[in-house]
Amino acid sequence: MLLYRAGHRALKRLRRDGLRPEDVRVLVGPASGPKWLIFPGVDRVLMEKGFGVPRNGGGHRLLVGSSAGAWRMLAFAARRPLEAYERLIDGYVSQTFPMPVRAKDVTPAYRRMLAEVFTDDDLDAITSHPHADVAIHVTRVFDPYPWSYRAAQIAAIAMGMAVHRLWTG
């Protein structure tokens, strides 16, 4: 079951026409760690029904993601999205790391995985599509003062809430 949150006019239109690919201007893939693995069924349907990158015109779409959500959005924008998506799933679930897991082991492993998942044709499609843009959000934090981490985190959350309130009214 999908829950639609929409204004009165939009809800009336959704009930009349259903949700159509041309109604979607932004597709978001949040950072989720391995939780993204619950989405393959939904993602496949979205790709098959044209909710990924507009292939034959159909407006312009922004695909936004961070972390694993960015990888999903890259697959949506690939030359052959379903094939790239299947390679992404296979590559992700086959990762193994020595214990304890360290960033110095994880980062190169994921770089290798992504290089195997996305072909040169995919990269061309992702970077040059006339009807879609992919935005990847990345944050890298260096915390020289461990005691300040919590304060910085709280400040960032507060700032995000303030921007959200200003943006949505």
Residue ranges and their predicted role:
Residues S67:
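Catalytic nucleophile serine of serine hydrolases
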Residues M1-L62, L74-G169:
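Patatin-like phospholipase
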